[in-house]
């Protein structure tokens, strides 16, 4: 009876663990997503910079967003963008890294440091290398070295890092709120005419690329650790069996 009770109690926990594991993306799927981000980045720049119709449409979309400008709208937009200034962005990164360490997840903390450090750096490096003159509609003007947007990159890097650090049960809420924040930052950049729509999309893709690479690294590390633990357990079991064969338990002495 006790054996059946033990088995029934253990099964839900085992199945729950298996379910959580199956919901985690594998290293291969994360790398595939990173590849899609690279393709998306290339297509976004090629279409925006080299296709005349898209070149003009980009400018028209920017002009349409600037028509939403109002004093209170501009104030809110500036407030959101101020949250991503370098000093504050660094504080967000330090907070998330510290939270990951407190939760006993140093690898996640390292992944957050890489994403929040390398994603904005990538955006700022690409700007002068891929600069091209933008079409202009009305009085809105954006300088050539604007693709991809550093603020859009920072916003998505922050959101994805927060999702990665958050407990599993809290991730849907963090992702939903973070998605609203990232979209609001993108709209703010357009309303204030800081960037073209293609710049914002490029920034989103840069941050997503680095997070996909970080998740691939985490999953590969988890798999190696699980393999090492399994091998260690197998060796330990073998050692116990050999020890038992060498030192059999003596039979009880009859009285």
Which functions belong to the PLM regions below?
Residues 6-7, 11-15, 98-106, 162-169, ...:
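Structural signal for the C-terminal ends of transmembrane alpha-helices
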């Amino acid at each position: 009876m006790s054996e059946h009770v033990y088995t029934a109690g253990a099964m839900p926990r085992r199945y729950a663990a298996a379910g959580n594991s199956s919901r985690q993306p594998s290293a291969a799927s994360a790398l595939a997503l990173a590849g899609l981000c690279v393709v998306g980045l290339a297509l976004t720049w090629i279409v925006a910079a080299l296709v005349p119709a898209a070149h003009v449409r980009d400018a028209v979309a920017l002009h349409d967003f600037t028509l939403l400008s109002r004093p209170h709208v501009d104030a809110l937009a500036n407030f959101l963008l101020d949250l991503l200034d370098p000093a504050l962005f660094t504080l967000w990164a330090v907070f998330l890294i510290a939270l990951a360490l407190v939760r006993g997840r140093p690898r996640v903390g390292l992944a957050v440091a890489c994403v929040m450090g390398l994603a904005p750096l990538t955006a700022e490096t690409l700007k002068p290398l891929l600069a091209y003159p933008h079409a202009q509609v009305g009085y809105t003007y954006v300088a050539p070295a604007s693709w991809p947007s550093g603020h859009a990159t920072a916003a998505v890097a922050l959101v994805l890092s927060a999702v990665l650090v958050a407990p599993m049960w809290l991730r849907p809420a963090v992702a939903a709120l973070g998605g609203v924040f990232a979209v609001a930052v993108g709209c703010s950049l357009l309303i204030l005419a800081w960037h073209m729509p293609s710049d914002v999309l490029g920034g989103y893709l840069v941050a997503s690329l680095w997070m996909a690479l970080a998740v691939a690294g985490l999953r590969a590390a988890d798999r190696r650790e699980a393999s090492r633990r399994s091998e260690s357990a197998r060796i330990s079991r073998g050692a116990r069996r050999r020890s038992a064969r060498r030192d059999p338990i003596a039979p009880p002495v009859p009285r």
